[in-house]
């Protein structure tokens, strides 16, 4: 989810999550360049669905905060097996060629600390670094004037975190999130992926927005297709889980075909709904209405899991998001994306804790 949109506190944020299955990197000979793992392909009996939740950070010290451990325990108590962390750098303008840390960027030592904390809590980790616009706005609008300079800066940024992820033992890594303004440049992105593989030996994905994934040309360089699954499911407010489940049918048919074409499973690197009336009409929006809609949020969780669980091409979901930081400046908690303390959390506990068959 776009932190710039969060800071703006208004509509439109289409975002990120990720985690997945125990896939290893490819490459059979010692001299061969690492590549995607064949075990990520649809129908592989060893591949399992991810059960994950994102714990974002909005300030430098969030991940070293005393409450971080409590949040991780709460996430694990839902039956989740994975947590995603989102260190974020910023660029000042959409056409700029550089990015930098700010007071909102998680510190490296804090990130290492929280990865270790997650492991001690029994959770696997996906590291999903983000680039956002410092003054707010959609990161999909990043379209640098000098593409070559931007990709050079981006490669420095993303390989920094790839090396950190390798050293800290993170089990999965995302090479980018919702960068639709650059993601059609397949040659440059393939170079980025190769640079990441030189630093990180685990499975890789890219988190494309739901309206971006079809135009990404470098899926075959990665181990799993990542989609931030913010498809609108209704044209008016509804807490009818059956109706919402039916809305997934044409989407899942399209995704099954896309997975087959690319011989890759599809991970919902993000999916989520605010607890507001009308959330299912615009899942990407932080502010759909001022009216609470916890039942609609719960119905949307139920519908997604019912519609997708058991699909051989589906690699699972990392929900956006578990965000209870006292200083996050986000939408009031009762209206926010977090399922914590709401009926949606009960859905996760019921679905995820009932059994572990096919889960990672």
Segments from the language model and where they lie:
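Aromatic-rich peripheral "rim/lid" segments of glycoside hydrolase catalytic domains that contact
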Residues: 2, 21-24, 39-47, 283-286, ...
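Aromatic- and glycine-enriched glycan-recognition loops and surfaces
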Residues: 61-77, 100-120
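Substrate-binding cleft and catalytic face of glycoside hydrolase catalytic domains
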Residues: 39, 78-97, 109-182, 278, ...
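Boundary/entry segment of secreted carbohydrate-active catalytic domains
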Residues: 24-27, 32-77
